[in-house]
């Protein structure tokens, strides 16, 4: 057998399938129609120009004509202009950049910017580089530093047993070094490479250079022009292998660094048009076609598509006069064939004759799971994913060939408005090229993302032949050829494969033979606001129904009016189903004609039924239908009380890839269903997909969807639960995984349960005290254990500013239609470290269907550092924030300024995850709730029985810090006692907050008034005048006022405190250090330290005015510590200044004070005195402790205090102090990483959208 296997030729044809679609036979017939002359726009994650097969076409042209990033994720603000001095400029990173003499720059001006590599590195590359940098750059050096620090500590401990103050500090120093190194290891965070960017005009074109080596020597970096000008690209290094190109906009003020955001786009392009001159068996479907790479997957959003990216992409597609678009992206949409993005796509297709091919989606096997735009937009050809036996052997290495099938996950039609959804199918898997940064040449990927470029490449072959023979075509004629010649697989349902598997050769022949004007037309089919007839819910199929259907011709752009006038089509209408009646003929001219179709589903058996009313031109009936009216009817099974609302299926046989659909009328009052699957096989484990979908008008299928991929062991059992809506049909689909081998038998049961709450969402206002809700067990006996859990507090924000302006050159639609942006700014405070989820309620969950071009928010800290971003789907963009103040900038784009101005006061919300969940008390009657007595526990409700419950308000001390009026707590109510019921039947809860109660402060002002003697007006005036003079003393910098007050009030402590603060805050503070020391001594001398120490030692103060005394003593202690620290800082600054000048601290007589004590001794005395009263890590003491360590050259202790200062006040200056100490300690690796963080943490401005 081994010999036979080695002699059998390798199935290369199955790696990137072409036989199944007729592409291989087409190329055998017409080898020169291999895509030449065809330009395919690949809208994806970007294409790597250095990837295998992405260099040239079969006729020697550049494979990629241009590479564009339309998302903005690679944009660099280069508006800052500088001129070199002595051939050097200082980049925004702080590095000195050496300008090569060979560069030509007539103006002498350079635009500079900065970009963190991790901002545009693909996620997988970023993770790999982070791991490699830690292993190669950090770990070896850090291990040596840590070992050395531990060794020094051990040696000191062995050699020194004494506990003198000096030894104590040295021991603390060595211990600090070890602790810091351990801490740095735990907190290790790689900032990644930070690149300086330069842009300049050489007199002819704009050029850019990125300091990819991060060393400032630009002679070693690549100078690039816009990619389209010379197909130039660079690489970020042999470790990264990340290729990049550039585009320069806005007169050099904006640089776009274009990289691939993932491997997906290159793989897609390779399937469609990869070319390997030396290995033709690896070619894509259309190796002669050229590629326009457009990155629409935003790296900031994990390569999620955005409205900005898509609309800019369509502008580029039109400007480059592309023939085809491949779009292997898509999302579920709330309403099909609508929205701003879809409008722009329609314009490109209808007005510019651009064929738009897209993936149908990977959300099967249930019906109506097609994505947008592939399966929901009339102008787009949606492609399903098919797998052939050859693919199973070559790509997936299956032990045996299975019959051809649709992949289990391939999305199915119809769309929610009745359109078929899937147009055609193509092979949905391939082993093809991927970007170099993956360190792989090829990779297996599957999905409708792969079927779409396979079909797109096939269409490129057709267009190549048509162009070579000067045969006119339209998007309508090409689509009709594809659909009318596709081959239907008998074992695959129409909603999965659409019209069938694309046949390139037959479609080409069709277009050559059918060149009539009628064939070039499109036809819009409307059924009210829908595009087909889709009867799904029980009420829709209970009786016959009549449907008015509009048929209207769509002419290609620039059609002559005379041709429109002469249009006269004689159409025959046919239907092959007895349950549909339609007219036999229709005369169609240049207007919308209406016909009536009657659908009578009463005699249909349970299950799914599909048919079409087709319109044929009687002049050429063999050309196939000019249009189709899709009709779908679902007859749902009923469950009732006699079966306990259960459906059971026993010993059901499943072949590999087999799907069984069950349409069930959900009983009124049902709120969740449970499905139990049991394997009957004792030999075979089986992989199944359990999928359920209910459709609700203007809600995407995902809103009421359950999906579970499960592996069922031999004789194993699985139970799952999911929510349902009563009174509507549900599709429950159980599918054997497409690649499973061997047959298997299973039993499965679907059981419905219902606990109905009076409100679909529970809204509780704290001011009401007690809130009531009622519950009913609708179907059967149910065990209840009601529980309300609150997990988030939600903060509502209003914008502090809203600015509207026109966008740049990339944002102009055809006919000079300028796009505009509104940027709204919001501020909020994060009271403590935690997870937040920002969102814009008005626009969230809307992408393709939104009436606005796009939405994108970016959150910044108070230093303008970007912390995170998000767009239409907020649940995908939660992030962790530390305590502090933050700014959110929200960009909304549209063509009309007036529509943007309506949003100038748009609210925005930030949902904060609670560190500990909160619960509300629930009672079974009002009196228990009112008195806070017995809480509700478990109870059993009989069918149709109603039970009220009463919820009490949350105690005020449980309200999270920062939450207040205008905020609410969000959580859920579960009613069932069972775990499955708790998981499936969940009711949202909003708890609205009110102002907190007013709290009285400790100590009463009335008591103070009673205990004090009434002051006469003269005494009050004297004190007020004194305090006024003290206030002005600090402003006027006058010693005269101070001396005058000191004579009058020699024992008034606030006077001396004010003088100390005045001197310590002066601009020329360094010149008055001795005065600061004297002022601090004056403050200290006026505090009775003995009395203060005695008071602090007291455990309890029984005196009636204890609160007042405590307040006074706390102030005295705070003042004492403050004075000691200011004195210590002044002494330390004096010594550090002396050290900087002389290189050492003088301890001789010249440096002594009049009393005979040296500044160093005075500093030590002050330090140890301070430690008596407070901890060195107290916020007020940190600066003194830090400077004391510096004076004593104990850089470990200094760094420990400096890092604490950074935590309390993360300024750039504090970070620089840390870096300096790291260098003094010899920890250059720590210093280097920290230095790289600085331009990231403290950018010059907000990053661009």
Curated annotation (Swiss-Prot):
One of its GO terms (cellular component) is cytosol. It is found in: Cytoplasm; Nucleus. Residues 998-1018 are annotated as: Disordered. It catalyses: Release of an N-terminal tripeptide from a polypeptide. The modification Phosphoserine is found at residue 915. Changing residue 500 to D: In IMD78; decreased protein abundance; decreased aminopeptidase activity. Keywords: Acetylation, Aminopeptidase, Cytoplasm, Disease variant, Hydrolase, Nucleus, Phosphoprotein, Protease, Serine protease. Residues 9-508 form the Peptidase S8 domain. GO terms for biological process: intracellular amino acid homeostasis; protein polyubiquitination; proteolysis. Its main location: cytoplasm. Its EC number is 3.4.14.10. InterPro entries: Peptidase_S8/S53_dom, Peptidase_S8/S53_dom_sf, Peptidase_S8_His-AS, Peptidase_S8_Ser-AS, Peptidase_S8_subtilisin-like, Peptidase_S8_subtilisin-rel, TPP_II_domain, TPPII_C_art. The active site is at 44 (charge relay system), 264 (charge relay system), 449 (charge relay system). The modification N-acetylalanine is found at residue 2. The modification N6-acetyllysine is found at residue 401. Residues 1003-1018 have a biased composition (Basic and acidic residues). GO terms for molecular function: aminopeptidase activity; endopeptidase activity; identical protein binding; serine-type endopeptidase activity; tripeptidyl-peptidase activity. It is linked to Immunodeficiency 78 with autoimmunity and developmental delay: An autosomal recessive disorder characterized by immune dysregulation, increased susceptibility to bacterial, viral and fungal infections, recurrent sinopulmonary or skin infections, and autoimmune abnormalities including hemolytic anemia and autoimmune cytopenias. Patients also have global developmental delay with speech delay and variable intellectual disability. Disease onset is in infancy or early childhood. The limitation of proteolytic products to tripeptides is achieved by tailoring the size of the substrate-binding cleft: the two negatively charged residues Glu-305 and Glu-331 that are blocking position P4 limit the number of residues that can be accommodated in the binding cleft and thus create a molecular ruler. At the same time, they orient substrates so that the tripeptides are removed exclusively from the N-terminus. Belongs to the peptidase S8 family. Cytosolic tripeptidyl-peptidase that releases N-terminal tripeptides from polypeptides and is a component of the proteolytic cascade acting downstream of the 26S proteasome in the ubiquitin-proteasome pathway. It plays an important role in intracellular amino acid homeostasis. Stimulates adipogenesis. This is Tripeptidyl-peptidase 2.
């Amino acid at each position: 057998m081994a010999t036979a296997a080695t002699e059998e030729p390798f199935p290369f044809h199955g790696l990137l399938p072409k036989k199944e679609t007729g592409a291989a036979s087409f190329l055998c017939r017409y080898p020169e129609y291999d895509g030449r002359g065809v330009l395919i726009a690949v809208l994806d994650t970007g294409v790597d120009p250095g990837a295998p097969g992405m260099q040239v076409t079969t006729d020697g042209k550049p494979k990629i004509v241009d590479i564009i990033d339309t998302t903005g994720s690679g944009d660099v603000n280069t508006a800052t202009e500088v001129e070199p001095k002595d051939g050097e400029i200082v980049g925004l990173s702080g590095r000195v950049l050496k300008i090569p003499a060979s560069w030509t720059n007539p103006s002498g001006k350079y635009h500079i910017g900065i970009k963190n590599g991790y901002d545009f590195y693909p996620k997988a590359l970023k993770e790999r580089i982070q791991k490699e940098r830690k292993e190669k750059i950090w770990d070896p050096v850090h291990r040596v530093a840590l070992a050395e620090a531990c060794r020094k500590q051990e040696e000191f401990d062995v050699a020194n047993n004494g506990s003198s103050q000096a030894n104590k500090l040295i021991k603390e120093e060595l211990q600090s070094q070890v602790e810091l190194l351990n801490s740095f290891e735990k907190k290790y965070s790689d900032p990644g490479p930070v690149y300086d960017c330069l842009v300049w005009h050489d007199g002819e074109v704009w050029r850019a250079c990125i300091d990819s080596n991060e060393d400032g020597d630009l002679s070693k970096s690549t100078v690039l022009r816009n990619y389209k000008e010379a197909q130039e690209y660079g690489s970020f290094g042999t470790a990264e292998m990340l290729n990049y190109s550039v585009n320069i906009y806005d007169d050099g003020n904006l640089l776009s660094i274009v990289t691939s955001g993932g491997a997906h786009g290159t793989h897609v392009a390779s399937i469609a048009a990869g070319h390997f001159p030396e290995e033709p068996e690896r070619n894509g479907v259309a190796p002669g076609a050229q590629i326009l790479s457009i990155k629409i997957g935003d790296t900031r959003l994990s390569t999620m598509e955005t409205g900005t990216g898509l609309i800019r992409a369509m502008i580029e597609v039109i400007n480059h006069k592309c023939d085809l678009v491949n779009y292997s992206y898509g999302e579920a949409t709330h309403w099909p064939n609508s929205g701003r993005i879809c409008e722009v796509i329609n314009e490109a297709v209808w007005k510019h004759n651009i064929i738009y091919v897209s993936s149908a989606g990977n959300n099967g096997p249930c019906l109506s799971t097609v994505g947008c735009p592939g399966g929901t937009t009339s102008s787009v050809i949606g492609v399903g994913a098919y797998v052939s036996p050859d693919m199973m052997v070559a790509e997936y290495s299956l032990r045996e060939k299975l019959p051809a099938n649709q992949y289990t996950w391939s999305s199915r039609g119809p769309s929610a408005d009745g359109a078929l959804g899937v147009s055609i199918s193509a092979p949905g898997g391939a082993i093809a090229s991927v970007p170099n940064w993956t360190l792989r040449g090829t990779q297996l990927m599957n999905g409708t993302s792969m079927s779409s470029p396979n079909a797109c490449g096939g269409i490129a072959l057709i267009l190549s032949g048509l162009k070579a023979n000067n045969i006119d075509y339209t998007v309508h004629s090409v689509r009709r050829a594809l659909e009318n010649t596709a081959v239907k697989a008998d074992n695959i349902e129409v909603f999965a494969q659409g019209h069938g598997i694309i046949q390139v050769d037959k479609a080409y022949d069709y277009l050559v033979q059918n060149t009539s004007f009628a064939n070039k037309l499109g036809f819009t089919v409307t059924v009210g606001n829908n595009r087909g007839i889709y009867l799904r819910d029980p009420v829709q199929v209970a009786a016959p129904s009549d449907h008015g259907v509009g048929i209207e011709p769509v002419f290609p752009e620039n059609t002559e009016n005379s041709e429109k006038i002469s249009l006269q089509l004689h159409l025959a209408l046919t239907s092959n189903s007895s349950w549909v009646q339609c007219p036999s003929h229709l005369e169609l001219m240049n207007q919308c004609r209406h016909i009536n179709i009657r659908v009578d589903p009463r005699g249909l058996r349970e299950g799914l039924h599909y048919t079409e009313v087709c319109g044929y031109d009687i002049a050429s009936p063999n050309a196939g239908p000019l249009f189709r009216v899709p009709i779908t009817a679902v007859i749902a099974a009923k469950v009732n009380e006699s079966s306990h609302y259960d459906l059971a299926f026993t010993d059901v046989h499943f072949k590999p890839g087999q799907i069984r659909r069950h349409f069930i009328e959900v009983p009124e009052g049902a709120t969740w269903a449970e499905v139990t699957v049991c394997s009957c096989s004792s030999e075979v484990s089986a992989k199944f997909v359990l999928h359920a979908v209910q459709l609700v008008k203007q809600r995407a299928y995902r809103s009421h969807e359950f999906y579970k991929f499960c592996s069922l062991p031999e004789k194993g059992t699985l139970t799952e639960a999911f929510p349902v809506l009563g009174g509507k049909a549900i599709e429950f689909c159980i599918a054997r995984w497409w690649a499973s081998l061997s047959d298997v038998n299973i039993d499965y049961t679907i059981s419905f349960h219902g606990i109905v709450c009076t409100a679909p969402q529970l809204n509780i206002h704290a001011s009401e005290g007690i809130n009531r809700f009622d519950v009913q067990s609708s179907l059967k006996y149910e065990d209840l254990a009601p529980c309300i859990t609150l997990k988030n507090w939600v903060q509502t924000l209003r914008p502090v500013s809203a600015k509207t302006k026109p966008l740049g050159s990339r944002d102009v639609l055809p006919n000079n239609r300028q796009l505009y942006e509104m940027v709204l700014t919001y501020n909020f405070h994060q009271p403590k470290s935690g997870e937040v989820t920002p969102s814009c309620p008005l626009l969230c969950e809307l992408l393709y269907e939104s009436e606005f071009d796009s939405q994108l928010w970016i959150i910044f800290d108070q230093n303008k550092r970007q912390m995170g971003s998000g767009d239409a789907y907020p649940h995908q963009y939660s992030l962790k924030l530390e305590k502090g103040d933050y700014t959110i900038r929200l960009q909304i784009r549209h063509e009309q300024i007036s529509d943007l101005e309506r949003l100038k006061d748009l609210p925005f919300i930030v949902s904060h995850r609670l560190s500990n969940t909160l619960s509300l008390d629930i009672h079974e009657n009002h009196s228990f709730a009112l008195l806070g007595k017995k809480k509700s526990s478990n109870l059993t409700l009989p069918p149709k029985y109603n039970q009220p419950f009463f919820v009490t308000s949350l105690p005020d001390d449980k309200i999270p810090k920062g939450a207040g009026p205008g905020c609410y707590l969000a959580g859920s109510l579960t009613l069932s006692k069972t775990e499955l019921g708790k998981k499936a039947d969940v009711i949202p809860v909003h708890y609205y907050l009110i102002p907190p109660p007013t709290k009285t402060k400790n100590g009463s002002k009335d008591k103070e008034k009673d205990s004090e003697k009434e002051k006469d007006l003269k005494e009050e005036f004297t004190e007020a005048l004194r305090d006024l003079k003290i206030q002005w003393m600090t402003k006027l910098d006058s010693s005269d006022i101070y001396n005058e007050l000191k004579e009058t009030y020699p024992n008034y402590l606030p006077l001396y405190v004010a003088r100390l603060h005045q001197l310590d805050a002066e601009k020329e503070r360094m010149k008055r250090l001795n005065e600061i020391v004297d002022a601090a001594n004056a403050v200290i001398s006026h505090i009775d330290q003995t009395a203060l120490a005695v008071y602090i030692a007291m455990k309890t103060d029984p005196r009636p005015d204890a609160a007042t005394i405590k307040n006074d003593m706390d102030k005295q202690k705070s003042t004492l510590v403050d004075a000691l620290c200011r004195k210590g800082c002044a002494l330390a600054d004096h010594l550090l200044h002396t050290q900087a000048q002389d290189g050492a601290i003088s301890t001789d007589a010249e440096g002594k004070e009049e009393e005979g004590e040296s500044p160093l001794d005075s500093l030590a005395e002050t330090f140890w005195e301070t430690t008596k009263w407070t901890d060195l890590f107290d916020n007020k003491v940190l600066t003194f402790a830090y400077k004391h360590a510096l004076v004593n050259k104990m850089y470990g202790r200094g760094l420990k205090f400096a890092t604490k200062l950074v935590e309390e006040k993360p300024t750039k200056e504090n970070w620089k102090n840390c870096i300096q100490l790291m260098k003094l300690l010899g920890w250059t690796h720590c210093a280097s990483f920290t230095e790289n963080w600085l331009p990231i943490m403290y950018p010059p401005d907000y990053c661009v959208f």
